[in-house]
């Protein structure tokens, strides 16, 4: 059976990347550079072999330590877990290439935001977000309006004028009273773009539309530490608030479907993720 690291390295090499394998803090990683040689990247494949929650917890602790050490040396690694790679292969390949600067560029100024229904949001997120759809109240799509200043061709499958290239969803309001004033807080539940496309300014444009239409007092969201440290939220004006504990998952070793333990679904493998970081944007002054 082909090891995960072998499979990922073979994919990269077919796409023109030179790969070297190293042992970093007891984990096999792939070291590569963008095709232009300007940026180095560390890719950290994580095979899923734990047969119990306890074993998964120990593995998560060891991986978390390695991630912290690698980050201090070389920046946050791109973590690719075995279940994601095997169940969502096409999306993961495109996301991997995008991290290595192989993507089609679109700019928010060439796009328009429209409200979409939950059916449209669910279909898009199922194919382009690692966790798929989540319950929400407000759904927005980002649609390509014109081709200027980016490399997407009008004949490309993802560059068609009018095509939806990103989606953002938000919850209904959670309300509380502070100093006699009602505060309406919303969660930004999902954001995803087509994995092979980088939409410069896309998150910001969707967020600004939501703020303009709904006029929230407060917006919060979570950065999944399996993917990033959440720097994009800081760039948008959010502030980090707290760390959320890791979540235990059960995984079906045949389909590679990942489900939270609390879902009651069965599986023969276990995985504990790396938790998440909570971010908040206050749009009303309160303590």
Segment roles from a protein language model:
Residues 55-88:
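Catalytic cores of nucleic-acid endonucleases
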Residues 22-25, 132-136, 161, 270-274:
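A short catalytic or substrate-binding loop motif that flags glycine-/basic-rich loops and adjacent residues
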Residues 23-46, 139:
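Short acidic loop-to-beta-strand element that houses the catalytic metal-binding Asp/Glu
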